Swiss-Prot record:
PANTHER family for the chain: ATP SYNTHASE SUBUNIT A, CHLOROPLASTIC
Species classification: Bacteria, Bacillati, Bacillota, Bacilli, Lactobacillales
GO molecular function, a single term: proton-transporting ATP synthase activity, rotational mechanism
SUPFAM superfamilies noted in UniProt: F1F0 ATP synthase subunit A (SSF81336)
GO cellular component: plasma membrane; proton-transporting ATP synthase complex
Name of the protein this chain belongs to: ATP synthase subunit a
Entry membrane topology: Multi-pass membrane protein
Length: 238
């Protein structure tokens, strides 16, 4: 399998991965267009495109609200909707096509097949939970709940680290493996003409399975985000 390289540019000490940046902007654009299109001319009795949006919205609220609680859900409902849609699209982009130049420069892939990208997403999720904890409960109460009793501080630190790491590695492992397998099947189809029907059928079946796994991973990522956030903002005070 040919090695692919994502194009990068440097602005001072900051390095930008152009493929990841382009894919992220594309995903944000698709989500904006979808929500804008589906929310135009909404009626009390939903139909057509409005049904699609409301179904996805109700689905996301259904599995996140038990963790956040009805008290705060209205403040985070749109965040979880957009996060779920973002992860679904990001996980499946690499299954749609492959754009790679002769020199191995890759211009199209799932952002979540990149470990650095997943680590960044995971870090932002953990950071968000702490920011919201401070905003909802105050700095002193947030620190107190994290450091009291004193002997559990190492365990709390370890828990935050494992949450961060597992959230990133879970999504990376599944999506990266899916793209690698797809590339291998495509490579098989170019070995000989008699391998083409086999590779085509196998790739079709694998793509369908990968789409299912990608959607499951988007569900798990959003669910765990709601769990981590709920644990931070719903702590009962003694």
């Amino acid at each position: 399998m040919e090695e692919s390289i994502n194009p990068i540019i440097s602005i001072g000490p900051v390095i930008f991965n152009l493929t990841m940046l382009a894919m992220t902007l594309l995903i944000v654009g698709v989500i904006f267009v979808f929500i804008y299109w589906a929310s135009r001319n909404m009626t009390l009795k939903p139909k057509g495109k409005q049904n699609i949006l409301e179904y996805v919205y109700d689905f996301v609220i259904g599995f996140t609200e038990p963790n956040i609680g009805s008290r705060y859900m209205k403040d985070y409902s749109l965040f979880f909707l957009c996060l779920f849609l973002f992860m679904v699209i990001a996980n499946n982009l690499g299954l749609m096509t492959k754009l790679q130049t002769i020199d191995g420069t890759n211009w199209w892939s799932s952002p979540t097949a990149n470990l650095q990208y997943d680590l960044t997403l995971s870090f932002l999720v953990i950071l968000l939970t702490h920011i919201e904890s401070v905003r909802r409960r105050g700095f002193k109460k947030s620190i107190k709940s994290f450091m009291s009793p004193v002997f559990v501080i190492p365990m709390n630190i370890l828990e935050e680290f494992t949450n961060f790491l597992s959230l990133a590695l879970r999504i990376f492992g599944n999506i990266f493996a899916g793209e690698v397998m797809t590339s291998l099947l495509l490579l098989l189809s170019h070995q000989a003409i008699y391998w083409y029907p086999v590779a085509f059928g196998a790739n079709l079946a694998w793509t369908a399975f990968s789409v299912f796994i990608s959607c499951i991973q988007a569900y798990v990522f959003t669910l765990l985000t709601s769990v981590y956030l709920g644990n931070k903002i719903n702590i009962e005070e003694e």
